[in-house]
């Protein structure tokens, strides 16, 4: 999703692969997969970012990056 990252491609790909394997293991349809991933994002923000304002900023940045990645995937 990100065009620039401080993480190596191998790290991102390994984590992404683990997430995909887990969703496939549970035979999660698209709507359930999105719901679970959305809940995971919420949990990550709530448990790791104390400021509600900063959570909102990060959520907006994530949403924008997601929309941009969908545009470039066409």
Curated annotation (Swiss-Prot):
Domain of life: Bacteria
Family in the record: Belongs to the UPF0352 family.
NCBIfam families, per the entry: PRK13689.1 (NF010242)
Protein's UniProt name: UPF0352 protein HAPS_0210
């Amino acid at each position: 999703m990100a065009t620039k990252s401080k993480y190596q491609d191998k790290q991102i790909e390994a984590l992404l692969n683990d997430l995909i394997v887990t969703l496939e293991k549970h035979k999660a349809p698209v709507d359930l997969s999105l719901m679970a991933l959305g809940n995971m994002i919420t949990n990550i923000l709530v448990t790791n970012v104390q400021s509600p304002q900063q959570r909102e900023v990060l959520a907006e940045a994530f949403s924008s990056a997601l929309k941009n990645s969908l545009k470039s995937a066409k």
